[in-house]
Regions:
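Small/polar-residue-enriched beta-strand and adjacent coil segments characteristic
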Residues: 10, 40, 46-53, 68, ...
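Charged, alpha-helical scaffolding/interaction elements associated with membrane systems
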Residues: 60-61, 203
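Terminal intrinsically disordered/low-complexity segments used for targeting and assembly
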Residues: 1-59, 106, 145, 229-275
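Acidic, glycine-rich calcium-binding repeat modules characteristic of RTX/beta-roll
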Residues: 77
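Periplasmic alpha-helical coiled-coil/stalk elements that build and connect Gram-negative outer-membrane
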Residues: 155-269
Length: 284
């Protein structure tokens, strides 16, 4: 009995540790915001395209789908582990038919004779139950259930990581488009200056040195565009991977950084925010 009681203590839920934390601090900058951030935080940027990508990633992302499959697998294993705590019932039924050379014979239980044919029916049922004296089966069930719960927190971690990756890739796309537009305007401006200097050189009032310097500036401006286009394509491909679509089917309008709303970030986030982190909840 002592060993059995010890096993029960190991599977009991541990109480939350009581910490002597002051309610207020001397260096507090003011009353903190008690409201927790919204779970759909991306809506604060007021971008319809970003919202669509976020919602699509939550339903079709392959990493999230794999995490959900692991949850289903863990639930099935937990059900299998729980079956050991239930009685085991088995039943059998068999029948046979034979033909005899005569119509005479003995009729016994489970058999019948008719016109030289003998039919036998045999049915049996048995039940067994394993007494979980040391708590092995129940501990196995609890371990399987905790594994399933841990997989649910892992799924939340994957979802948060995926959503953060979608947001970062989309903002990189918008930033790359903005930089390409700026570089295009710089090229046009450098081209106009180059044409003006060349016109003065042709008229004999300009310097060949000024023309060569401006030609170098124009070449540098043009050379800055291909890396920006490559970065734009790479981030667009990242978005396509995150939403499980071919890159050719991803059409991004992007826009400009100036058109994106900046959510208000309040100082003094509540410490309860840490309890929403799935990695911390998994360890607990």
């Amino acid at each position: 009995m002592a060993a059995t009681s010890g096993g029960c203590i190991l599977t009991a839920d541990l109480p939350d540790p009581a910490l002597d934390v002051p309610a207020n601090y001397k260096a507090a900058a003011g009353a903190p915001d008690k409201a927790l951030p919204s779970l759909d935080w991306w809506r604060g940027f007021r971008s319809q395209e970003l919202t669509v990508l976020m919602e699509e990633a939550q339903t079709v992302n392959l990493d999230i789908a794999a995490a959900v499959a692991r949850i289903r697998q863990a639930d099935a294993l937990a059900q299998t582990a729980g079956a050991a705590l239930l009685p085991n019932v088995t039943g059998t039924f068999s029948g046979s038919r034979s033909r005899s050379s005569s119509n005479t014979g003995v009729i016994s239980a489970g058999s019948s004779i008719g016109r030289g044919e003998v039919t036998n029916h045999v049915a049996s049922m048995s039940a067994s139950y394993e007494i979980d004296f040391w708590g092995k089966n129940r501990d196995a069930l609890l371990a399987a259930e905790e594994t399933a719960n841990a997989n649910r927190f892992d799924r939340d971690v994957v979802a948060l990581t995926t959503l953060a990756s979608v947001a970062n890739a989309w903002f990189n796309v918008v930033a790359s488009q903005e930089r390409i537009n700026i570089a295009t305007r710089n090229i046009a401006s450098a081209q106009r200056i180059y044409d003006a200097i060349k016109a003065r050189v042709d008229a004999g009032t300009g310097s060949e040195l000024d023309l060569a310097q401006q030609e170098s500036v124009l070449a540098n401006q043009k050379a800055s565009v291909p890396p920006l286009r490559q970065a734009l394509a790479q981030n667009a491909n990242i978005l396509a991977t995150l939403v499980a679509r071919p890159p050719e089917r991803v059409r991004l309008t992007g826009g400009s950084l100036g058109s994106i709303a900046i959510p208000r970030v309040t100082p003094g986030l509540p410490s309860d925010l840490l309890t929403q982190r799935p990695d911390i909840r998994r360890q607990e």
